């Protein structure tokens, strides 16, 4: 199975650097010089030549892609890795696609619903949960609200504020 670790953005300068939208928790290792990444759509493998951070944005150059014109053709290309080729992750490591279908429960074990998706790429990640009442609930994916993810046990533990999953008294019903 392939997993997207980044998306190539716009060129930066005239020497073949591109901005990269990072989608991995270890970019310094994943994009180290010499790292080989597959592309989607398939444009052949890309080998990282240089990597540096500039104002919070990762800038990469690739071997054989040496100027702005050449790198412009990579815009919006997804950089992917094959999960089967990856080293065994930590016991508590997970990938976003593994959350789909997990039970969403409170810290006391009360069922809240089922995880539908994890939206990434915005200001912060957002967990999409289909509540027990069928409504879709968006939960900011931050530790105070999502204290634990347990893929092996098939659950995501949530500590939602009052009213997020249960209607508050006085709210109109849909």
Swiss-Prot record:
| Residues annotated as domain PRC barrel | 91-164
- Quote the cellular component terms of the Gene Ontology held in the record: cytoplasm; ribosome
Which GO BP terms apply? Answer: ribosomal small subunit biogenesis; rRNA processing
Main subcellular localisation = cytoplasm
Q: Name one GO molecular function term.
A: ribosome binding
Q: Where in the cell is it found?
A: Cytoplasm
Q: Which UniProt keywords apply?
A: Chaperone, Cytoplasm, Ribosome biogenesis, rRNA processing
Subunit structure and binding partners: Binds ribosomal protein uS19.
What's said on domains? The PRC barrel domain binds ribosomal protein uS19.
**What function does the entry list?**
An accessory protein needed during the final step in the assembly of 30S ribosomal subunit, possibly for assembly of the head region. Essential for efficient processing of 16S rRNA. May be needed both before and after RbfA during the maturation of 16S rRNA. It has affinity for free ribosomal 30S subunits but not for 70S ribosomes.
| Family (UniProt) | Belongs to the RimM family.
Q: What is the name of the protein in this document?
A: Ribosome maturation factor RimM
Q: Which organism is it from?
A: Kineococcus radiotolerans (strain ATCC BAA-149 / DSM 14245 / SRS30216)
Q: Which gene encodes it?
A: rimM
């Amino acid at each position: 199975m392939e997993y997207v670790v980044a998306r190539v953005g716009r060129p930066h300068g005239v020497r073949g650097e591109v901005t990269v939208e990072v989608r991995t928790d270890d970019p310094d290792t994943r994009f180290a010089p010499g790292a080989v990444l597959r592309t989607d759509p398939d444009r052949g493998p890309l080998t990282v030549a240089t990597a540096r951070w500039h104002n919070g944005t990762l800038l990469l150059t690739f071997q054989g892609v040496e100027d702005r014109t050449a790198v412009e053709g990579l815009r919006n290309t997804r950089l992917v890795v094959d999960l089967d080729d990856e080293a065994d992750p930590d016991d508590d490591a997970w990938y976003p696609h593994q959350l789909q279908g997990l039970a969403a429960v409170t810290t006391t074990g009360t069922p809240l619903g089922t995880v539908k998706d994890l939206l990434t790429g915005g200001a912060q990640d957002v967990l999409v949960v289909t509540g027990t009442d069928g409504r879709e609930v968006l939960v900011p994916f931050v530790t105070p609200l999502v204290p634990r993810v347990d893929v092996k046990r098939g659950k995501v533990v949530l500590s939602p504020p009052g009213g997020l999953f249960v209607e508050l008294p006085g709210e109109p019903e849909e």
